[in-house]
Amino acid sequence: MTTGARAAGSFDRAYFDKWYRDPLHRVRTRAERTRQVAFALAAAELLLERPVRTVLDVGAGEGHWQPIFTRLRPGVRYTGVDPSAHAVEAFGRTRNIRHGSVESLDALDLEAGYDLVCCVGMLYYLTPAGFRRGVRHLAAKTAGLAYLELFAQEDDLIGDLPIGTARPAAWYRRTMRAAGWVPLGQHCWVPALMAHRVAILERGW
């Protein structure tokens, strides 16, 4: 399977050209990204029983998901966060991308909670301590559903993958549970405070 990989190196224009625009290396096509966004929206709206109004996209890169969100849900308030200076300089104003990371969410001037929180292609690059801190910050910002792309050591991945970062699925399960997350499958998660809105057989634990 392919990932929207975010390596630990420089997130400059060349990085995005290779992994997002070059047909030989890009991890997802525009059509595949659109299906991801449509699915995340549908899952969140099923949970909330209303249209999604606010989206937080952490690790947004150049904000490739922003135009898809606004096309599918005109009027949605999209906020992107990314550590890439290039992404913020090139797209920060037009796509509302702020400089920061999942580990620094608590230091950013963000809304108290978002209907849909997305973090795709970056969580598995964090150190164990950074991961624990990051997923707690994400839970604090999720007022509905989170779409958190996570892959484990047991998955067959293709992408810009740094050596030695993959961790066993059991580690992710323990860590996510300790951070208060409830899994729904297909990369969808809800914080414990939202678990009452999910049928018992839908929950992963």
Stretches found by the model and what they are:
Residues G121-Y125:
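Short catalytic micro-motifs in class I SAM-dependent methyltransferases
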Residues M1-L110, L126-W205:
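Class I (Rossmann-like) S-adenosyl-L-methionine-dependent methyltransferase catalytic domain
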Residues C118:
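A conserved beta-strand element that flanks and buttresses the S-adenosyl-L-methionine
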